[in-house]
Amino acid sequence: MYTTHMDVKIEESWKRRLAEEFEKPYFKELSGFVHKEYQGEAVYPPPKYIFRAFDLCPFDQTQVVILGQDPYHGPKQANGLCFAVEETLPLPPSLQNIFKEIESDLGKPLVHTTGDLSR
């Protein structure tokens, strides 16, 4: 596990590829800034979910990376994966639209009924 100012978990294959980046001054400065924000404000996702995507999927198994533009800003919404929410929460409109587009492209309904995208 790679540790910055925060205790985050990153899968070994990503850690090897990102280690050099983590040592650069800009990243250390950014890490310190984020750490301070967590100390004084409500920040999402919870610290344990920072870099979650890099822990759930090894580098060599990654085929697509989706970056979110507008992060979720409410309690229990952000879980470290773009557009995903905990399975007990209702599907956000953005994720509903993504599922509709996938269904349209594939021509068949999806079996996904929750916003948990970790599977």
Q: Could you describe each region identified by the protein language model?
A:
Residues H5-L18:
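Generic N-terminal amphipathic, Lys/Arg-enriched alpha-helix
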